[in-house]
Design a protein with these regions (language model features):
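Structural and coupling elements of P-loop NTPases
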Residues: 1-171
Length: 171
């Protein structure tokens, strides 16, 4: 019992937002965030194009074409971009060049698996992880781990009592 409408959005709404009458409380389970399968470290070539880089990557991520991650305690100077298919890297590069006038440097990363840390009470900085595992966060502050193999996932679960990992995130 609802309508689907088109709304002009000046950047206020995100995919999955619900608009309803004031006073109505509506609660949905989050839309699953699907796990990307390919990762790259991305930064702008010209440091003077930082605003264009941030605006462009944020906009493209908001559209759902890419997911943006950061290393813990890192800024937006360089980000880890996750995609489902490698062609999305080409789309990112093209759009940043042509729509935002921002050339980028992209380095493919060896990670194949990403997992969301379910436990809110676990500090990811204290986890005992294999050397090929990277601790990251998404733009909403959720903590995640990047792995190169199933072996590394099992290592993390075996060496960190109570750690719960999810294959999908929720918004």
């Amino acid at each position: 019992a609802g309508d689907i409408i088109g709304v002009f959005d000046p950047g206020i709404f995100s995919i999955g937002d619900t608009i309803c009458s004031p006073g109505h409380k509506v609660q949905f389970r989050g839309i699953p965030t699907f796990a990307p399968e390919h990762f790259a470290l991305v930064r702008q070539k010209d440091t003077m194009k930082r605003k264009q880089f941030i605006k462009g990557t944020s906009q493209i991520a908001q559209e759902g074409a890419i997911q943006i991650f950061q290393e813990l305690d890192a800024g937006m100077e360089e980000v880890i971009v996750g995609v489902v298919g490698v062609l999305q890297f080409d789309v990112l590069k093209y759009r940043l060049q042509n729509e935002y006038n921002c050339d980028i440097i992209m380095e493919t990363l060896p990670y194949e698996f990403i997992r969301w840390i379910v436990n809110d009470d676990i500090d990811p900085k204290t986890l005992d992880l294999a050397s090929d595992t990277k601790k990251i966060q998404d733009l909403k502050g959720n903590h995640l781990l990047l792995f190169t193999s199933y072996w590394s996932i099992n290592w993390a679960l075996e060496h960190n009592k109570g750690l719960e990992l999810a294959e999908f995130g929720t918004n």
